[in-house]
Amino acid sequence: MKEATELNEDMLEEAEHLALLEPEDDGTFFQVTNLLNIMDSESAKTDTTGPGLDMRKTLASVIITEKATTDPCVVMNALIRCLQMPEISTQRKMNIYNIMQEIIQQEGEMEEHCIQRLVAIASKQMRDITEAEDFETAEVASETLVALSRNHFSLVMYELQHHLKPLNLTDEFVIVTLAKLANGNVFEFMPYMGITLATIFTMLRLANEAKMRQVICSAMETFCETVQFYLRHLEDSLYPVMTEDQFAVKLFPMYRYFVTVWLRHQDLEVKLGVIKSLRPMLSLLLPNDDLREQVYDYIPLLLAEFQGTGHWPLFPSLLQVLRQILEASVTTNTPIPPMLLHPIFTELHVQVCSKAPAQQQFSSQNLMEIVHCFIALARSYPKELMKFFFSQVEMSKEAVRVGTLALIRAVVSADDPKINIKTIYLAIRVVKNTLSDTRSKVRMAILRIIGQLVLSGFQEKIKGWGLKYVSVQLTLSTYKLTNRRECFYQRDLEEKMVHKVTMDTVKIITSSISGMTNEFWVRLLCYIMETDYTEALTPICISLTNLAENQIHGKDTEAGIAGKSKHVDLPAPQKLLARLLVLMSSPYKGEGRGIAMLNLLRTLSQSIAPSMADMWEQEIPLLVQYLEEHTEFTWNQKTWEDMLIQFLRNSLKKTRGTSWSLRLSKELNNQIETFDSPSLEKGFLYRALGFTLGMGLEADRVEVLLLELLYKTDYSNDFDREGVILCFGLCARGQVKTVLNVLQDFEERIQESEQSWQIGAWRKDHPWRRETVKSALMVMYSCVSSYCHPQMLLTHVDSPITSKIIHHYSSSCQDISLKMAFMKSVVQVTNAIKSIQDPEDFQFAHKSALTGLIVVIIKAEPPDHLVSPVRSMAMDALSQLSTMKPFYSPEESTELMDISIHTVISLQPPGEDNESVKTLYANTMSSLKQLMEGLLQRQLDPKGLQDTVHLLEKWILSEKEWEREKAMALHLHLMQIYVQSIGVCIPLKLGQFGVLVGLIAPCTCDAHRRTRLASINVLSSLLDLHVSQTCSLWGTSKEQELQKCKEDLQDTDMNKISSASSRVAKVVCPEFNCDEVVSLIQKLCENIGAMDLQHDRAAVTWIGIFLQMRVKELEDKVAEILGAILVHLPVVDHPEVRRHLIEGILLLAHYHQETVLTSLLRQPLPMESHLTEVWLAVAENVPFARTMLHGLLGRLQSRFTAKINATSKADIWRLAAVDPLMTLCTIQLLMEKMDQDDKFPDLFPDLLYTFLLQLGSSHGPEAASPVLKTWRLVHTGPLPQEMTLQRCSRSRITIKSMQLLVKRINREPLEQALEEQSVWSLLENGGTFLEGVSLMARLCMQNMENYMQRLAELVLTGMGSEILSCCISSTAICVEFMSDPVLHQEKLLRPVVLMLEKGAGQDKDETLQVLSLRALGNMALGAPRKVKQYRKLLLEKCLGSLQGQVSSSAMAEGMEALTKVLAELREGDIGSSFEAISKQCRAFFDNESELLRLKAFVLFGKLTKVVGISKKHFFKGEVKRGWVSLLLHCQDPCPSVAQACVATMFQCVHFWGWKSLESSFGHSNDSINEQMTVFQTNMCSVLAQKKPAVLCGFLLETTVFMKNNLSRIRIAACNLAGIIMKQLSAHYLKKMDLVGLRNSLQDLQLDSDAGVRRAALETLKVLDSCNQHWLLASPRGLP
C-alpha cells in the first residue's frame, strides 16, 4: 500500500513537471518555432542533396543559442514547450536537445523550476523507447542530462536515483547515464557509488536480455575505472573517504556473478562485455590478499572460455585477464595453486601450438600476451614449466615442438634476473632432446635458440653441441638446396629459410665467440670449395677472412697455428684461385660476394702464389674499388669480366715458364661441371679456360685438354655449346693449328660420316644428337676464323673452315638450331674476311653455294608469324655475302630482295606485352633494311630503283596496315639511300616519277600515322630528286607549304589529314609534265580498291586535282587517262569514289568531248553499271547532256552519210567507228534520265529519223522486197545467231528510245495512235518494219506538223545515202510523204522524185525498187497536179517495172503505181505508152501470182476508163484477146482477183457493143457462178448468132485453159466449153477438133479434183449430146 502511494506521488509529481507550460512570451515561442521549422526543412534537404545546404540549419541554431545568452529562461521554456508539442518528429527532438546542450554550456542562469521540468522531460523521453528512432532521442536526452549535471548534479542524480530501485530492473539509458555521470563527475558521484553498485547487483538476476547485460557490463567497467581514478586522487576528494578494500568487497560479488553466470552466456557480445569489465575489477580485487585467492578459484572458468567454438574474438581480452592474474601472483609472491598450473600450461601451450583456422590465428600482440604469461610462469615455476616443456617435446608433432622451442627461446631472451642459470640449463636439456629432428621448422627453432643463447651471453653453453649442430645444418641445408626438385617447391622454400637462419647463426657466432676450433675453420673453407649453393658465400668469406687474419697474426691460439707465418692451411692453390675467380665473375650475388672474395684472396695471396702476391696487392684494391663504385644495377658485366681476365693475364705472366698455367687450366676445366647452365660464372669459366689454354706452351697437352672438353660437353645445352665454341675461338688466337687439328681429330674419332654417327657411346648421361654436334662444329670453325690471326685466316678460310661449315649443314636435318648456327657461321666468316686490311682481291669461292642454302632457309620460314631469329640471321648473312667478291648480278639481287621482303613484311606485328617478340621483330626489320640497302647500292640507277619499288608495291597496297607501314618505312629508307647516293647523276625515266608518286600518294591519308609520315617523306625525297634532275623552279614557298602539310598529317582528325593531302597534290602538280600526269593517274587508278576507303578517297582526290589543274594541256593524253579510269571504274565499290572518278571523266568530256565520247562508246556491251553511272552524271547537267546527245546523234547519223576526211584530232575521234548499239543504249539512258521538262523540240525530228534508220539497219539490208499489202521482208537466208540477237537487242533498244521520245514530247494523240495501231510491234518485227515505218510517218504527219520540214529534209538526205538500209528506210518514209502535200509545199518534190527515179530504176535491191515505185505512185495522192508534169518519168519507171527480169513485187507495185497515175492522166497524156501498158497488163491475166493477176485486172479496168477514140480500136482487140481469160478468171480461186476480174470484164463489155449484156450480171439473187453461167450463155448465144467464128475461136482458147494449174480455172474452162458447144451450130462444130477436145476432157477424168472431174464429165455429156444431135440431123449413111 505504501509502495502504491509512493508510486502515485511520483506520477503526480512527474505530471506536474510535464504539464504544458503557459506561454510567457509568445513572440519568442513563435520565433523559436520558425527557426526550428527551418532546421527541419534544411535537414530534409541535406538528406537528399548532401551537406552543402546545412548552412541555414546551423544559422538557425546559432540564432536560438545567441538569443538564449540574453534570456535563457525564456528561450529554454520555449524549447521545452516545443519539446512537449504533440506528434513532434524525432529530428526536431534531436535539434531541440542539441540546442539545449549548447545553451546549458553557456553557463547562463536559469530558474530551478525550468531545470526541473527539463530534467523530468529528458528523463521521461530517455526512458520511453518504443521504436528504433527513440534510441536516438534517448541518447541525446541522456547527453542533455549529463550536460545539466555539470551545474545541477543533485537534480539530475536525484532523478536518476529515483528510477534506480532495488530488485527492479530499470531502463538501460538510466544505467548508461549513471555511467556517464560517474565518468564526468568522479568526486560528486562517489557518495552514490556504493548504493549504485548495490542496487545494480540486485538487478543482475533480472537482466535476461543480452542488450541489458552489455549495458551493465559497460557501466561496471566505467564505475571501476572511476573508482581507480578516485583512489589515485584521494587527496583531492572532499567527500567521505572510501577505502580500496571497501570497494573490493562491494565488487567481488559482482565479479563472481559475472564469471559464474554471465560469462557462460551464449551471446559473444555479452561474453566480450563481461571479459572487458573483468580487467578493471581485477585491478581492485587482486591487491586484496583475501580476495586474491578467491579470484584464483575462478581461473578454470576463464580457461574454459579458450575451448569454446567461435570464441576467438574473446581471446585477446581473456589473455590480458589471465596475464593480469599471473603477473599479480609474481609481484605479490602469492603462488597459484599447483593444481591449476598444468591446466594453465596446457591451455596456453595449446593456443601457441595448435593450427587454428585462419580467422582465429593470433596477432603478434596476442602471441606476446601468451609469451608474457609463460615468462611470468617461468619466474615462479621454472622447474614445473621446463618439465612441462620436456613432456611436450617428447611428442612427435612438429607444431608442438616448434611452439615449445619458440617459448623456450622467449624465456631465454627475457632480460629478467629472476630467470637464473638453472632455468637456462633446464631449457638446454629440453633443446638437446630435439636435435635429431630433421623437420625444417624444428631445425630453424633450434638454430634460433642457439643464436639467442649467444646473444644472451651464454656462449660457453654452445661450444660443443651448438657449433657442431650449426656446422651440420650448414652442410645439410646446402646439400638439399643444390639437389632440390621442382615438384617440392614448398620444401625448397622451407630449406631456404633453414639455410638463412643457419647463416644468421654463423654470423652471430663468428662475431661473438672469441675463439674458434680448427675443425670449424676447415668446415667453412671446404664449404667455399665444394658447395654448389653460393648464396651464403659472402658471410662465409668474411668470416674466413677474419679468421685467416687472426691466424696470420697469431691471435687465435686455439687454432694451433704458430702465429709468425703468413701461410695458412689451404687446398691446392690453383683450385682455390680457379674457384674464387669464377665466383667473382658474379660479384653482386649473395650480398656482394665479390668484395668479400677479393679480400679473402688478398689475405691468402702468400699462401696461394707468392710470386703473384705483390701484383695482387696492387690490382685487387682496384677491383674492389670498381665494385664499391657500382651496384648490381650499374655495373657492366663485360667490363668486369675484362678486368678479371686482365687480372688473370697479369697473374699468369708472373708464372711464365712454369706449369702453373696448365694446372690452372686443369682446375678451370674441372670446375665446369660444378656450375649450372646458364650462369655468369660458367660463361666466365669458358672464357678464362680458352684464354688460359691459348697461353699454354705445350701444344700436345693443350690438345688433350681441348679434346677432353669436346667429349664432356653437353651439346644439347645451348649455353655449354656456346661456351665451348668461345673457348675454342679464344684458344685459336694463339693455337689455331692446334685447334683445327683437335676438331679434325674429334670428327675422326666420333666417326663422323653420313652412314655412321655414333656419338652417344661417349655420353651416357647426355646422349648427343647429331644435329647439335654439327651445329657446334660449324660455329666452332667460324669462331676460329674470327679469332685467328688474319694471315692464318686466308690460308684456312676456304678449306677447311668454309667447306666444313657447308658439309656439316648440308648433311644435317637442318632444324632451327642448325640454321641459326649455319648463318651465324657465315656471318662470322665473312666478317673475319672483311676485317683483313689487305685481302689481295680475295675471291670467296663458296659464296654461291652459301647463298643458295640461305635462300632455301628463308623460303622455308612460316609466312605469317615470327618464331625464331632465322629470318634476321639469314638476311644478315646475305648482307655480308653481298659485299664479298664475286658480286651478285642484278637479277640475283632482285630475287634476293623479293624473297626477303615477302618473308618479313607479311609478318604480323607483335603484341604490346611480348617484349621478346617485339625485339625479334625489330631486329628482323633492321636486317631487311640493311640487306635492301646493300643490294640497292649495287644497282644505283632508275631501273634498279623501279625494280625495288615494284617489289614493295603489293605490300604498300596491302589491306593490312602493318604491312603498309613496314613497306612504306622500307621504301623511305631505300629512297633516302638512293637520293643520297645518286643525286643528279642519272635522271629518272619518262613517266617513272609519276608512277612512283602515284604509288605512295594515297598513303598520305593512311589511318596509321607512321605510314602517312613515311609516305610524305618518300614524296619529299622524290621531289628533291626530280627537282634536282629537271632544274625545276621549286621555290621556298612550296617547300614551306609542303612542310606545313607534313605537320598537318600528324593530326588524328581525318578531315584535316585529307585536306593536307589535297594541298600536297596542289603543291606538287606543277612539277609534272603531261606524260608524268598520265602515269600518275594510271597508277592511282590501278591502285584503287587495293586498300581501304580512305586511300581510295585520297587517290581520286589527287586525280581530280591533277585533272582540274592540267586538263587543258592533256589533249593528246585524254584517251590514255580515260582508258585508265574506265578500266578500273568497274571494280570501284564505294559510291563516293566512283562519283569522283566520274566527275573526272565529265571534266575531260567538257574540254575534249569527241575523244571522251568515242572512248565511252567503244566500251563493250552490255553497258556496265559504271558506264551507266557516267551517263547518269551526264544527264544531271542538262546543257551538257544536250551537247552530248547531239554528239551521239552525229555518231549514229555518220553511219549513213558519206565518209569525210579528218582535218583535226577531234575529227579523228569523231569519225572513229563505234558500236551503234552502244550509242543507242546511251541515247536511251540520257533521254530517260534527263530533266523531264526538256521536250527536245529541236532534236525530235533528228532523233526520230535516226532511230528509224537504226531500226532499218538492224533488220538488215539483205531483206527481199516486200509483198504487197503485207510489208514483210523475206530474207534470202538465215542470219547468224549472234547477229540475230544483236539486231533484236538493237531493235528493242531503238524502239524503247522512240517510245521515250514520243512520251517526252507529250503528244497524247500520237502516243495513243501508235499504241492502238501496234506500230511498235510492227517496227520491232523485221517482216513488218516497213509497214511500221509507213504508219509512223503517217501518224507523225497527222500529229506533228511542225516537224515535217526537218523530217522531210532528213529523208531526202537519207535517200541519197550509200547505205542500202538507210535508203530503204528513207524511201519508206517518203512513200507516206509522197501521199501528202508536204513535199510539194516544202519545194522538195523534185529532188525526191529524182531520188525515187533512181531507186525505181536500180535492180540491186527489190525492196528499194518496190518502195520507190510506190512512192512515185503516191504522187497522184499527194501532188496530183504534178503527175502530168512528171508523167514521162512516172510512165517510164512504172512500165519499166513490167518488163525485163523484174521481181513479181516490183511488177505488182509498178501496175499499182500505173493505176494511181492513170487516174490523173488522159489518153493523150499517155501517148504510145498506152499500147505497151495494155499489152503488159493483159500478159499478167493468167499469171500464177494472185497479186499480179489482181493488179493486172485492176490496171486493165483503169485502162478502159482512160482509152479514147484513137486507141479504142486497139484496145478493143486487146479486150478480144483477153476475153476468155476474163471470162474464166471471174471464177478465180482468189476472191479479190475474181471480183476485180468481174468488174473489169463488165467495163469491157461495151467494147463488144452488147448493151443487152451489160445489165445481165449482178441483178439477181443467184450465186456468182450461176450468174456467170447465165451471162456466158447469153454471150455465146449472141456470138453464135452474130459472130460464130469468134465463138469457135473462144472454144479453142478454152480448150487450152483445161490444162491450167488452177482447178477452178479448169472447171470454168470445162463449163465454158460446154456452153459454147451448146450454142454453136453443127456446121461450126464439125470444123472443130472434137477428137482433141474429147481427149482433153477424158484426161480431166483423171484429175485429182472431184469438181474438175464432174465438170469434165458434164462437158463430155454435152459433147456426146452434140454428136448424137449431129447424127440425127445428118442424112443416113453420112457420118
From Swiss-Prot:
PANTHER family in UniProt: MAESTRO HEAT-LIKE REPEAT-CONTAINING PROTEIN FAMILY MEMBER 2A, MAESTRO-RELATED HEAT DOMAIN-CONTAINING
Domain of life: Eukaryota
Pfam name, any one: HEAT_Maestro
Gene3D superfamilies: Leucine-rich Repeat Variant
Lineage summary: Eukaryota, Metazoa, Chordata, Craniata, Vertebrata
UniProt KW ATP-binding keyword: no
HEAT repeat extents: 68-91, 92-128, 190-229, 293-313, 314-350, 380-417, 422-459, 571-610, 614-654, 737-774, 848-887, 991-1028, 1219-1261, 1387-1425, 1632-1669
Keyword Repeat among record annotations: yes
Gene (UniProt): Mroh2a
Keyword terms: Repeat
Descriptive protein name: Maestro heat-like repeat-containing protein family member 2A
